[in-house]
Regions:
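Short arginine-rich
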Residues: 493-496
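Formylglycine-dependent sulfatase
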Residues: 35, 40, 45-457, 465-490, ...
């Protein structure tokens, strides 16, 4: 380091200036050394508080890709999402890491797939403290952090060694009268306003705004009471086309619109405070819609989610659409790199910054989705382990335990929730499909939703966008099937999935912290570890 030495004959003002510069240089050097000792990238020091972007992460609960205005739905109204699309970047092929709440959120927070996260790969579990999370790393580097609504959930923090939600300190005080009864009364945007008011102005912030909508239950008839026309609803071919399903979808749309209204209010707060253009705004969902053959499956209706990002200072040519294939876990390294931090080595997800800059990304040619135990809906707490690779043209799924019921057992006595096919949320659509499953026109749809599945599934997305015709075993696609199988298993080996590397597989035996309605229902203890005694 070069220091300034001046003769004692130099004018006093110049000597005082030189002394000030020396002290500044020493202070900067000390700060750099301290930062390195804390394990952060030196690049973050090159960004001032004004340069480091704020982060507002807005996440709905159970919303499929198709159900926004910008993504083409003619009924649901999402002006906030549509604005982020218009002023930012829309992703057409974003996928959750797992189509179930807790594991998906664990992957988002840690930047890792669920098979690397031990019990966090299950819902109603815990997220071990040894796994670094992006909010914690940002806080250590000088960010204010917080969350409102649904952060990491559902599960228990204490068994994983945590005392605070991984999304940050809670801001839950403000309440409102929701438009319909089944919606939460949390004032999500109001709590964000409280966070902004309490955060030091000189520090950047990272805030998680997570609604419980559109998670079930819904108020029956809510959609029609808002004036929505059931005849205009686009019915996915995986569902029967009738008034029951149409009105169920309308009620779901109303919940999405509540989420969008909260995002709109949050954007207005940023505009009013002058922080909008230095804030990365992300609007997305944790996984797909709470309907049969959607949520808790690896098909697109369960795993493909809306994603739009606005960041004027970091996204070139705003208004673009990207068809890159990505997972939501890619957001963690993206946020860290945007803040000038180097993601820790345990984060295997890949930053989206090259895509922000409209550069080709070799890391986003395929997405990978996985599931272990969703709700405890098989005897002894068994899950339905499966992995998938999604490319632009095909979806390949490998089911590791094809003799198990994929949507939960039809016998409610072996389900913790005491309902048949318990991994599908109760709903008018599910009830209708179960009651009329033997009727003409319903039988095949019911079999797709509730029936058994083979070890391998392969779908041609150009001819079968809702993945209804399994082509695994077809001679015409034998090469494609082999190629995708290899790509999937190579990725699982590289990222150390114990399902394929031969490591300890305990997902069927980790404790279940959800509500148990079935008397005597328990998780079978592990034959290879004492994990049940945790």
């Amino acid at each position: 380091m070069r220091r300034c030495y001046l003769s004692s004959l130099a004018p006093l003002k110049i000597r005082l200036l030189a002394l000030h510069l020396n002290r500044q240089l020493i202070t900067m050097t000390t700060a750099r050394l301290l930062f390195l000792l804390l394990g952060f990238s030196i690049s973050s020091l090159e960004l001032t508080a004004n340069d480091r972007p704020n982060i507002l992460f807005c996440i709905s609960d159970d919303q499929s890709y198709a159900h926004t205005g910008a993504n083409g739905d003619p009924v649901v109204k999402t002006p906030a999402f549509d604005r982020i699309v218009k002023e930012g970047l829309r992703f057409t092929h974003a996928f959750c890491d797992a189509p179930t709440c807790g594991p998906s959120r664990s992957a988002i927070l840690t930047g890792q797939p669920i098979w690397r996260l031990e019990e966090a790969g299950n819902i109603h579990s815990t997220l071990p403290a040894k796994f670094a999370t992006y909010p914690d790393l940002l806080q250590k580097s000088g960010y204010s952090i917080g969350y409102t609504g649904k952060g990491w959930s559902p599960g228990r923090l204490e068994p994983g060694g945590r005392t605070e939600n991984p999304a940050g300190p809670p801001y839950q005080q403000k309440r409102l009268q929701p438009p319909f009864k089944q919606m939460r009364n949390t004032d999500y945007a109001g709590n964000f306003a409280t966070f902004l008011a309490q955060s030091p102005k000189e520090k950047p912030f990272c805030f998680w705004l997570g609604t419980s909508e559109p998670h079930r239950g819904f108020e029956s008839g809510a959609g029609k009471r808002t004036g929505k026309d059931p005849s205009k609803v686009i019915i996915p071919p995986i569902f029967p086309d009738n008034d029951i399903v149409r009105n169920d979808l309308l009620d779901y749309f109303v919940e999405i619109e509540h989420f969008d209204s909260q995002v709109s209010r949050a954007i207005a707060l940023l505009e009013k405070s002058g922080q909008l253009d230095n804030t990365i705004i992300v609007v997305t969902s944790d996984h797909g819609m709470p309907f049969p053959r959607a949520k808790a499956t690896l098909y697109d209706d369960g795993s493909r989610i809306p994603l739009a990002i606005r960041w004027p200072k970091g996204i070139t040519q705003p208004g673009r659409t990207s068809d890159a294939l990505l997972n939501l876990s890619d957001l963690a390294p993206t946020f860290l790199e945007a803040a000038g931090l180097k993601p820790p080595g345990m984060m295997t997800a890949k930053s989206l910054l090259p895509i922000f800059k409209n550069q080709a990304s070799k890391n986003h040619k395929a997405a990978f989705v996985a599931m272990e135990r969703h709700d405890g809906c098989r005897k002894g707490g068994k899950g339905y382990p499966c992995r998938a690779i999604r490319t632009s043209d095909h979806l390949y799924i490998h089911n590791f335990e094809p003799t198990r019921w994929p949507s939960g057992s039809p016998d409610p006595s072996v389900c913790a929730r005491a309902i048949p096919y318990g991994e599908i949320d109760s709903s008018p659509t599910k009830t209708f499909m179960m009651e009329y499953r033997n009727k003409h026109g319903i039988a095949r749809l019911a079999e797709l939703a509730f029936g058994m599945r083979p070890t391998e599934e392969l779908y041609d997305l150009k001819t079968d966008p809702h993945q209804m015709n399994n082509l695994a075993g077809s001679l015409l696609l034998a090469k494609t099937q082999a190629t995708l199988r290899k790509k999937l298993f190579d990725h699982l080996k590289t990222t150390k999935d114990p399902r394929v590397t031969g490591g300890l597989v305990n997902w069927d035996h980790y404790p279940y912290y959800g509500v148990i309605y079935t008397k005597g229902w328990t998780v079978d203890p592990s034959p290879t570890s004492n994990i049940q005694s945790k």
